[in-house]
């Protein structure tokens, strides 16, 4: 049995929705045990509420538990072409895992959201840097998801990982095509994890 963690941060719910789609895809794979968790919120509760943050029910992960999984698929909104501060704060607490090599050889993937489409690929590839320092095996999705060839509408999705475009005011929700790419990413990473660890 390969253990897959879908670990995310979401303020307004876009990445939370994508995380559930990633997990749904991963659960299609026989021999994959899939868990969804989120990183802790670092914003004071009153500021989070005032900013319109969405309450989420996923359990909160601890940095130490990352060593328990065979594959981790990270989801983060874009903040100036980088991962969110909450995800960065969480990953900055993994120094002990780095020192012991606890994540070496584990599979890692990334999905993201952007307000206007700017920075989604940069967010994924800049997150890969942290995964590389941990010795994780980075798993992009390439162009194997057919939805990536559809140019009939505005949509996220890259060969690096699933993405969604939330719009400048956050009103646009992930489209069916974006969710399909997210499900594909989950299934693809979980399938590799089962082949390697199952």
Curated annotation (Swiss-Prot):
Coiled-coil positions: none
One GO molecular-function entry: NADH:ubiquinone reductase (non-electrogenic) activity
InterPro entries registered for this protein in UniProt: Flavodoxin/NO_synth (IPR008254), Flavoprotein-like_sf (IPR029039), Flavoprotein_WrbA-like (IPR010089), FMN_Rdtase-like_dom (IPR005025), NQO (IPR037513)
Residue ranges occupied by any Flavodoxin-like domain in the UniProt entry: 4-189
Keyword NAD attached: yes
Pfam families per the UniProt record, alphabetical: FMN_red (PF03358)
Residues that hold NAD(+) according to the record: 12
Swiss-Prot/TrEMBL catalytic activity: a quinone + NADH + H(+) = a quinol + NAD(+); a quinone + NADPH + H(+) = a quinol + NADP(+)
UniProt superkingdom: Bacteria
Cofactor binding mode and count: Binds 1 FMN per monomer.
Recorded family membership: Belongs to the WrbA family.
Name the record gives this protein: NAD(P)H dehydrogenase (quinone)
């Amino acid at each position: 049995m390969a253990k897959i963690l879908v670990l995310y941060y979401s303020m307004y719910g876009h990445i939370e929705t994508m995380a559930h789609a990633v997990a749904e895809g991963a659960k299609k794979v026989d021999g994959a045990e899939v868990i969804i968790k989120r990183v802790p919120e670092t914003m004071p509760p009153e500021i989070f509420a005032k900013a319109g943050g969405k309450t989420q029910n996923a359990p909160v992960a601890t940095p130490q538990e990352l060593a328990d999984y065979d594959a981790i698929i990270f989801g983060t909104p874009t903040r100036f072409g980088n991962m969110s501060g909450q995800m960065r704060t969480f990953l900055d607490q993994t120094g002990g895992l780095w020192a012991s090599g606890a994540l070496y050889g584990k599979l890692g993937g990334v999905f993201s959201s952007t307000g206007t489409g700017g920075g989604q690929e940069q967010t994924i590839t800049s997150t890969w840097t942290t995964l590389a320092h941990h010795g994780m095996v980075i798993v992009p999705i390439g162009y194997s998801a057919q939805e990536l060839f559809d140019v009939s509408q505005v949509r996220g999705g890259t060969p690096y990982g699933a993405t969604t475009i939330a719009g400048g005011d956050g009103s646009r929700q992930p489209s069916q095509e974006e969710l399909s790419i997210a499900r594909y990413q989950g299934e693809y990473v979980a399938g590799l994890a089962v082949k390697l660890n199952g």
